[in-house]
Every structure is written in C-alpha cells, then in structure tokens.
Amino acid sequence: MNRPEIQIVAISNVFTRLMHFVNRGDYEAGHTHTYDHATMISAGSVLYEVLDGPDGNAVKAKEFKAPGYVFVEKDKYHRITALEDNTVCVCIHALRTIDETIISPDSFIDPMYSTNNGEIKNAVRQLTGISWNEITRYEQVGGHHG
C-alpha cells in the first residue's frame, strides 16, 4: 500500500489537491484541518474514516463512489483509502490566513500556479508573507490502519 500521487493547483485563492490512488488499498494518512472543505471523488471509490485522534483509530467510516463529494469537517482527524485501482479524489478549499481569513485573489500577481513539487508553497509564501503550514494548517498524523 502506498500514498497517492499528488498534483496541486491554485487558481486565485482556490486550492485543489488531486490525489491519484494507483492501486486499491493506497491511502492518504490520517490528518486534520482547521477549516471545513470538500473532497470530490471523480473516479473509483474510497473508504473515508473519521479518526479518534493522532493514533488513527477509526470511530466512523463510510464508502463513497464517484461521482460524488465528501464533506470534510474541520478539526476531525480523517483518512482516505482507495477501494479500487485508479481512484481519483480532489480536495478543494480556499487559501486562508492564520486567522481563517480567505486570501483575496487580488493579492496574487499571477492568477494561477500549478505544481507537483512544492512550487505553490513558495509562491504563496512570497505573495502573502505567510508560511504554507500557517495557511493550510495541514497536520498529518498516524499511519495506515493496518
């Protein structure tokens, strides 16, 4: 079991993170956010689990099939596991400052950045003066559920 292949695109202040789960059983490790967002299931199917915290024990689980969306609640640890080969999911949310203010599209010099290797993190830091971790508050925890 592996982690998904990732592609990131930010247009104005809309951030998308495409996850391509090549094989059934590939997973996105448990993590949490300080904001609500949506994950679009565009191909295949996933097991979405809400975890009890950093140790990664599932307290709720539900299967989702494409096409569809998963509402990802803020401050809830969660994990996504592919149930089919070539499953594709896209996390969608607004870029925010540390105080949860959505970053204005007017603050960007160029309206679009696309990356596979972290260029978006540097671009956001340069344009806003805020670190990527402060904006996304993406905290990864735990491992896979064995």
Question: Where do the PLM segments sit?
Answer:
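Double-stranded beta-helix
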Residues: 12-20, 79-146
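Short, conserved beta-strand element in jelly-roll/cupin
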Residues: 32-48
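Short, surface-exposed charged micro-motifs
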Residues: 7, 38, 47, 69, ...
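Residue "hotspots" at secondary-structure boundaries inside conserved domains
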Residues: 20, 30, 39, 62-63, ...
